[in-house]
Amino acid sequence: FDSHISDWILWLPTTKGFFSPRNVKDVHSYGVELKANVDVRLGRQWALRLDANYSYTPSINVGEPISAADRSVGKQLPYVPRHSASLTGVVSWRGWAFSYMWCHYSERYTMSSNDLSLTGRLPKYYMSNISLEKSLQLRWTELSFKCLVNNIFDEEYLSVLSRPMPGINFELFVGITPKW
């Protein structure tokens, strides 16, 4: 893809703890997004699904400097990773599904100048999640119960500067899909 965007609204954190919009006059966002998947039947009741995704997304400020001190022109937008990838594997059997998901996010800048100081960038990180799901087919509905364990290796990471994300955490879901 190759996009030229006018008036890109960039939400950046402030020193007061909230996000504030900032207008970036002109942005050139380009790159490649790749996706692949494979479905394999392993006998009558077993199935395996593999999904892979990769994105290369430079997003560059190509507008005019807003002041003499503006060093953001020609630089990657803050908090936008250049590279991201994910791999997911799902094994299914008799209404049960076990999945493993691995994600990667490249280094992200926290300042529009792409300053390489300690606070000017967030390091790359890798994330792993697992889930177990059971689906039940009833005459009038489909019920599903799902348990997720996110960040199973307790990776320390930041999505926004000075705001650590949770370590290992859990989610439970119940789904009801009526059959009308």
Q: What is each of the regions a protein language model found here?
A:
Residues 1-4, 20-109:
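Gram-negative outer-membrane beta-barrel transporters
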Residues 10-18, 64-70, 107-114, 150-156:
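Flexible, solvent-exposed coil segments and beta strand-coil junctions
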Residues 14, 43, 123:
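Acidic surface patches and DE-rich sequence motifs
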Residues 48-51, 75-180:
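Conserved C-terminal beta-signal and adjacent last beta-strands/turns
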